Curated annotation (Swiss-Prot):
Protein name: RH-like protein ID
Keywords linked to the UniProt accession: Membrane, Transmembrane, Transmembrane helix
Entry function: May be part of an oligomeric complex which is likely to have a transport or channel function in the erythrocyte membrane.
Family, similarity comment: Belongs to the ammonium transporter (TC 2.A.49) family. Rh subfamily.
GO cellular component: plasma membrane
Keyword Electron transport among UniProt keywords: no
Pfam families: Ammonium_transp
S-S bonds: none
The organism of origin for this protein: Gorilla gorilla gorilla (Western lowland gorilla)
Tree of life domain: Eukaryota
GO molecular function term, any single one: ammonium channel activity
Transmembrane spans: 12-32, 44-64, 77-97, 125-145, 172-192, 203-223, 238-258, 265-285, 287-307, 331-351, 358-378
Length: 417
């Protein structure tokens, strides 16, 4: 019988993290330089503001969104920040190396930092499926593999299907959810006997998670419009995302009350349902011609999110063989697929309306992009999950899942192990 005492990462974590940081520093020293061009000052400020919005979404929004677990709130917030900081550095280098041939010095611009932040967001979404089961060393491995897989997927899609930055990045929801669920499928699933309540939410952490959801709700229009080049497309993306998430809020509160026998609102449902519209319109936000369509999508997405939260967890966890505490499947993969379908429909209508006979080709291209993203996500996720199962990472014992005391010093508490 294995010991229930926590496995210390005192030597493993500093050695791994600091060695990696030193390697990244050397890579930045030899292979990068800042953009020396004279950019329009107004454009520079606008670009920085969008990047700032994305950083707030990543650090505060996703950081607090996963902090609702009883006994695991500290780790959720801090580990997300750690993954973000590491992921952005690696994504800047990777995007630079993959985007130029022959290889040369990587030019760092505000746009490249924005792109890297969005790539790192993929890891934060995926990590929701494994937080509580893994330690920081395992998360370091997950960050490196997922950012590499996402960057490779984007490069392949861009070269094969000739898509722009916005389109190949908006596969991020489906990609991140499939990657995270694949990793979770490979990890030990059941909580130890007597510790099943550790992945349940508590009142104060749940309020913190709602704070994260509010930050995401405010800045989601910036995320959906960040990579669009045309001012008209950016404007449409901002407007449509705002309408969609606004309707999602009304739907989430109303349907949550309707679903409870006594008409009470479930805060757990609220965390993700208020964001459902933003995920659903992400791919097609610049193509939606009218506010009412974005509002309908927000309504449908909110219904799917609430319905999934109420009906699917037990069924999906049992069928898929995972323990998806952060409900990744129906909050990102299902809504991401809905968004992809809506994009294909709008693209077909736009192509037919323009008298273009390439409708079938456009549909095949869109389906090909989505299929490739899913295949790469599932394959790389399975490989990552198998890699994280190696004993060298000193994974937490099942009895210490969702337990902050494994990783943090609590001066007012006894050790208790």
């Amino acid at each position: 019988m294995s010991s229930k005492y926590p496995r210390s990462v005192r030597c493993c974590l500093p050695l791994c993290a600091l060695t990696l940081e030193a390697a990244l520093t050397l890579l930045f020293y030899f292979f990068t330089h800042y953009d020396a061009s004279l950019e329009d000052q107004k454009g520079l400020v606008a670009s920085y503001q969008v990047g700032q919005d994305l950083t707030v979404m990543a650090a505060i929004g996703f950081g607090f969104l996963t902090s609702s677990f009883r006994g695991h709130s500290w780790s959720s917030v801090a580990f997300n920040l750690f993954m973000l900081a590491l992921g952005v550095q690696w994504a800047i280098l990777l995007d630079g190396f993959l985007s130029q041939f022959p290889p040369g010095k990587v030019v760092i611009t505000l746009f490249s930092i924005r792109l890297a932040t969005m790539s790192a967001l993929s890891v934060l979404i995926s990590a929701g499926a494994v937080l509580g089961y893994v330690n920081l060393v395992q998360l370091v491995v997950m960050v490196l593999v997922e950012v590499t897989a996402l960057g490779t997927m984007r490069m392949v899609i861009s070269n094969i299907f000739n898509t722009d930055y916005h389109m190949n990045m908006m596969h991020i929801y489906v990609f991140a959810a499939c990657f995270g669920l694949s990793v979770a499928w490979c990890l030990p699933k059941p909580l130890a006997k007597g510790t099943e309540d550790k992945d349940q939410t508590a009142t104060i952490p749940s309020l913190s998670a709602m704070l994260g959801a509010l930050f995401l709700w405010m800045f989601w229009p910036s995320f959906n419009s960040a990579l669009l080049r045309s001012p008209i497309e950016r404007k449409n993306a901002v407007f449509n995302t705002y309408y969609a998430v606004a309707v999602s809020v009304v739907t989430a509160i109303s349907v949550s009350s309707l679903a409870h026998p006594q008409g009470k609102i479930n805060m757990t449902y609220m965390h993700n349902a208020v964001l459902a519209g933003g995920v659903a319109v992400a791919t097609s936000c610049h193509l939606i011609p009218s506010p009412w369509l974005a509002m309908v999508l927000g309504l449908v997405a909110g219904l799917i999110s609430i319905g999934g939260a109420k009906c699917l967890p037990g069924c999906c966890n049992r069928v898929l063989g995972i323990h998806d505490s952060s409900v990744m499947h129906y909050n990102f993969s299902l809504l991401g697929l809905l968004g992809e379908i809506i994009y294909i429909v709008l693209l077909v209508l736009d192509t037919v309306g323009a008298g273009n006979g390439m409708v079938g080709f456009q549909v095949l291209v869109s389906i090909g992009e989505l299929s490739l993203a899913i295949v790469i996500a599932l394959t790389s996720g399975l490989l990552t999950g198998l890699l994280l199962n190696l004993k060298i990472w000193k994974a937490p014992h099942a009895a210490k899942y969702f337990d902050d005391q494994v990783f943090w010093k609590f001066p007012h508490l006894a050790v208790g192990f």
